Amino acid sequence: MFNYIMADNNFDVVVCVGPHDFNIVSLSMCYTRKNVIGYRNIYLVSSDPNINIEGAITIDEKIFPFSKKDLIDQFGNNERNGWYLQQLLKFYSGLVIPGILERYLIIDSDTFFLNPTKFITDDGKHYITTGTEYHKPYFLHMNRLHYSLKKMHSSSGISHHSFFHTIRVKGLMTLVEDYFSNEKPFWKIFLDMIDPNEFMDSGASEYEIYFTYMHLYYPDEICVRELKWENCSRLGPDCVTKNDFVSIHWYSRK
């Protein structure tokens, strides 16, 4: 089974872009096209279907089975809704985007790969890059999704990108939906299990969930690695020269 799944090393790239990053995604995409090794297509998932960036296929987020309105209805109209929405867009991209390959690399729209970087090993495993973050509410949330999901690795799965395999994402969704007696779809359970007291801070992480699931159930399909990276305020020489990639979040830009 493993050899069958890993026989095809092609993959696509998915970038979810929100209003905060409309002014930076064109530049980050230049670095993606230059330094991500081996991709086929780049899909840009956006609330603005008219956004047009060279080398990318724009996907209207309206084709997904949920919307920002679902979050507004549940949590009220607030600035964090978009942050949780993009997490769900990442999970569902492999199920919704027409013609997307089974494997896809998620890259945050404010993340810049500075050096040529591989994402699949020679024997077909997915590289997953680790970070150092630890935020307890992430693990409390995933454990509410399913009792088996708990911190399994000393490092974090958060590094502003991740490599998803649709067959494994489906497995994760089925695990959670079955646990909740198939009464609701995964995306609704994901939202329901966010602690309201943590919502406005950071109450869930798609990257930690997927990293934990793969490390627990399919460790032979991933290769955990460390790259040099950091969060920066600008794309300056102080960051560029010492890192493999950087992220420049909207709230810290100079």
Task: Show which residues each predicted segment covers.
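N-terminal anchoring/stem segment of glycosyltransferases
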Residues: 1-69, 250-254
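Short, solvent-exposed loop/turn segments at secondary-structure junctions
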Residues: 18-22, 48-51, 63-65, 109-114, ...
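Non-transmembrane alpha-helical segments in soluble domains
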Residues: 33, 94, 173, 177, ...
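Active-site-proximal specificity loops/subdomain of glycosyltransferases
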Residues: 53-96
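Conserved glycosyltransferase catalytic-site signature
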Residues: 83-91, 110, 203-208
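GT-A fold catalytic core of metal-dependent nucleotide-sugar glycosyltransferases
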Residues: 89-130
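Conserved catalytic core of nucleotide-sugar-dependent glycosyltransferases
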Residues: 117-195
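A glycosyltransferase accessory/donor-loop signature
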Residues: 185-254
